[in-house]
Regions:
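Alpha-helix C-capping/helix-to-loop hinge sites
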Residues: 18-22, 42-46, 70, 103, ...
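Divalent metal-dependent phosphate-bond-processing catalytic cores, especially two-metal-ion Mg2+/Mn2+ enzymes
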Residues: 23-33, 37-52, 64, 125-223
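His-Asp-centered metal-binding catalytic motifs of divalent-metal-dependent phosphohydrolases/nucleases
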Residues: 53-81, 96, 117-126
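Active-site flanking loop/helix segments enriched in acidic
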Residues: 8-36, 76-87, 188-192
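Short alpha-helical hairpin
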Residues: 1-17, 67-68, 72
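Acidic/histidine metal-binding catalytic segments
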Residues: 47-60, 105-120, 132
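Active-site-proximal helix-loop elements at catalytic-domain edges
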Residues: 21-23, 98, 102-113
Length: 223
């Protein structure tokens, strides 16, 4: 089996773009590394013990599951006409799988590379039967929930120059229409993942509640 370190180095070349401050933007690369590590941990949980899993292919797919994003973001910034404007999430998955194939040909055995591409294409597919695709989906969803999810949202709000009020109100709207309950119910394949997500949502809820209190000064004792 090939070593994962050279693949990580290739992924870094693909996933690191330029930030609005013209610095290296490692956001997507860091996300993909986290997803890779969580996917590996989930693949070893008791629920998945009977599944046949190619852990190397799973790790590579986790690294490249959003490989198209950096290129699409560059197109948005530099081109007046670009396909990214009309690309669906499904399109992005297929584009990412193509990029993985292009960049890893000769680095990963052909049959394993085909599996990597199929894992990427079938991720977040409710009808997926591929074990690795289920695990990748759960790991990716977990990275969008809890403290990491709050950090991702606040990062976006800061980059867009938006106020704390908007972040707090967006969270409150999600709570009002049961957004988290629906996600916990619908997006996870493994009960292990669902339990982790429940704990993460609870921690995020506590943080956002405190953020809202501090924003309004409600944590200051009455005289």
């Amino acid at each position: 089996m090939p070593e994962i370190e050279p693949i990580i180095a290739i992924a870094r070349e693909v996933l690191v773009g330029r930030s609005p401050l013209a610095r290296e933007d490692t956001f997507l690369f860091d996300h993909s590394l986290r997803v890779m590590h969580v996917a590996d941990r989930l693949s070893r949980c008791e629920e998945a013990a009977s599944w046949r899993i190619d852990r190397f292919a799973l790790s590579v797919a986790a690294l490249f599951h959003q490989a198209a994003t950096v290129r699409l973001d560059e197109e948005r910034r530099t081109s007046t006409v670009y396909a990214a404007a009309t690309m669906s999430a499904e399109d992005v998955k297929h584009y990412s799988a193509e990029l993985a194939g292009d960049r890893l040909r000769g680095q990963v055995p052909a049959r394993q590379l085909e599996l990597v591409q199929e894992i990427i294409r079938r991720a977040h597919d409710a009808t997926a039967e591929l074990a690795e695709a289920k695990i990748l989906s759960d790991a990716d969803s977990l990275d969008d929930i809890g403290a990491l999810g709050v950090w991702r949202d606040l990062r976006r709000y800061c980059l867009e120059g938006r106020a704390i009020d908007e972040a707090v109100h967006a969270w409150e709207r999600r709570e009002e229409y049961g957004y988290w309950e629906a996600r916990l119910r619908d997006v996870f394949y493994l009960e292990t993942s669902r339990r982790l997500a429940e704990a993460r949502v609870a921690s995020a809820r506590a943080f956002m509640h405190q953020l809202g209190r501090e924003r309004a000064g409600d944590d200051i004792p009455a005289e």
